[in-house]
């Protein structure tokens, strides 16, 4: 993978004259261009939307830039929900994916009208008890076993073991959860899955889609 720095050493030296170190420099042009590229790549899918993981870079300026480019945010904690709200995200702008979720976090996600993604079958009754069941709801799928891709063009081998992960539901749990959610008033259902970390190969996405659909 070619590394193309957006900042020259000379430019960095110039910035140092005015800004105390340490500091971070972000490429706004590059961020906007990449957001537009991914939106264009999936423009065939009317319902597509990119959700940026706030935990990756909880910087309000970056979040506002991505909001201007039509992106939503993926939150996993109360702090991330509050930050996203302060940046103007609300409702379907927010995907809330959390593990062992505290009551306050779940209530906040519900109050914001966020898409809530349940990672455990026991969370159905928990959500109903502490906040209520929204019309739109997601469940996280864990197919179990081992997930493996061949070596990528970059020379990386992608492998992880969803079967050892403590997050996500089996197919049977997914079906039971959807039935319970439907009985409690949910109307629209989504599927979420995260099968391997640090994947940089494009082959991951069609493989994952094949498992889900």
Give the label of every model feature segment:
Residues 1-116, 121-135, 150, 175-189, ...:
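A charged N-terminal "starter" segment
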Residues 97, 138-140, 168:
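Residues in well-ordered beta-strands of folded domains
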Residues 100, 143-145:
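Short, flexible active-site-adjacent loop segments at beta-strand->alpha-helix junctions, enriched
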């Amino acid at each position: 993978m070619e590394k193309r720095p957006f900042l020259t050493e000379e430019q960095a030296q110039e910035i140092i004259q005015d800004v105390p170190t340490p500091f971070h420099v972000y490429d706004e042009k590059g961020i906007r261009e990449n957001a537009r590229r991914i939106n264009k790549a999936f423009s065939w899918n009317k319902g597509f939307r990119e959700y940026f993981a706030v935990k990756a870079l909880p910087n309000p300026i970056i979040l506002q830039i991505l909001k201007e480019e039509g992106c939503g945010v993926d939150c996993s904690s109360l702090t991330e929900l509050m930050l996203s709200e302060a940046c103007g995200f609300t409702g379907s702008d927010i995907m809330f994916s959390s593990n062992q979720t505290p009551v306050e976090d779940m209530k906040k996600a519900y109050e914001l009208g966020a898409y809530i993604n349940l990672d455990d079958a026991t969370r159905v009754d928990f959500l109903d008890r502490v906040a209520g069941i929204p019309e739109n709801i997601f469940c996280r799928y864990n197919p179990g076993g081992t997930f493996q891709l061949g070596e990528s063009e970059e020379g990386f081998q992608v492998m992880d073991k969803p079967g050892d992960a403590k997050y996500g539901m089996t197919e049977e749990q997914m079906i039971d959860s959807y039935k319970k959610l439907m009985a409690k008033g949910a109307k629209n259902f989504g599927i979420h899955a995260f099968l391997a970390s640090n994947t940089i190969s494009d082959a991951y996405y069609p493989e994952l889609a094949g498992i889900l659909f």
